[in-house]
Amino acid sequence: AQEIITNKSPVSILSNILIIAENNSLTIKATDSTVKFTTSLPVDIQEEGSTTIFCDKFMSILSNSPSGDMEFIKDDITVTIKPIAKKVKFQLKSQTSDKFPEISKYDNVPFFEISSKDFKEMIKETIFAVSDDRNRYFMTGVYFIKNGDILTMVATDGRRLSCVNKSAVNIPDFTPAIIPTKILSTVLKHAPEEGNIEIAVI
């Protein structure tokens, strides 16, 4: 989530993460208005609710807290974080969740598997050629398309052009898309070197 948000946004709420506690699950959402991130984990909940807190300070608290369970307590204007194993607590100012941009939930989306190594190689061979000119949006990401049994990634900044192909056997057809570099950089950083990853193009 921290890699998705931006502290340079004129919209302060985009520097926050949205935290939702419901159905014995804690869901965290983040967005920079272009890229969206959602993850969930099982938790014990005494009272359901939601709020937003400043992501960088929250991550600083987590990185400086002992390992183990933590307790989150929310009131109207703050969130209190208490590591169970240590007699200390942290407080963060919060903003109401109704100010946070809507992040759509897509059910029954068809995912397909691809070799993580192959996908990361495709990213490395194209991402360097992406334009950083925000006035030419179609050049600020990598074009991703399936043509027959071939997956193709293409990137250009108007001067350089990079194109890479990989076999797409057993991969279903999908609508071509421009993938933002922030997503691709995150995949490069966190995707495993071996095994497969799942992708859905909506």
Which residues does each predicted region cover?
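Structural preference for solvent-exposed beta-strand-turn elements
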Residues: 1-202
